[in-house]
């Protein structure tokens, strides 16, 4: 895919060594600044997975850049009260840090798989994570309030994909009600981000097809 597109893979400062998470708005400011310095005037596609969907949604509703398509893979669209987020923060911190302490040994307890292809990324995330950064991120993420508005035109080019076996599938109905003009493919029999993890080439080809043909490709596991 990088042979056809200028691919940018931003990572939250929460998982970067020596960086300080300030707020969602600051994260967006950093991404916007990078795009401006690179001379980017249009985005063919924005892709976000899991909790990255929360930050991506904030980006979509604030950026002035034209966006061709959007693809959410197993988006974490939870709406959680501030009290619950406060309680879950230390537990989440220990879970992520354990990935580093155990050299990836606890990954299978957190995710459905512990493939060697993804383990290094989770270990690095656990190593770099600080409690302060995580607390700040959770304090302004997954908030218990209505989803931000997206224009009908952008909704028509936005794909909210979920695996039928993943826990995040439970958010699908609420997202469909918030964005009725969007597309909601279901990957039958698939778990959280399974297609992206197990067949990264196929996943990339799917994204390219959406960007170029304005539709999902014919995939045998898409629920009819």
List where the protein language model places each region.
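Gly/Ala-rich beta-loop-alpha elbow adjacent to hydrolase catalytic centers
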Residues: 47-52, 56
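Conserved serine/cysteine hydrolase catalytic core
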Residues: 136-177
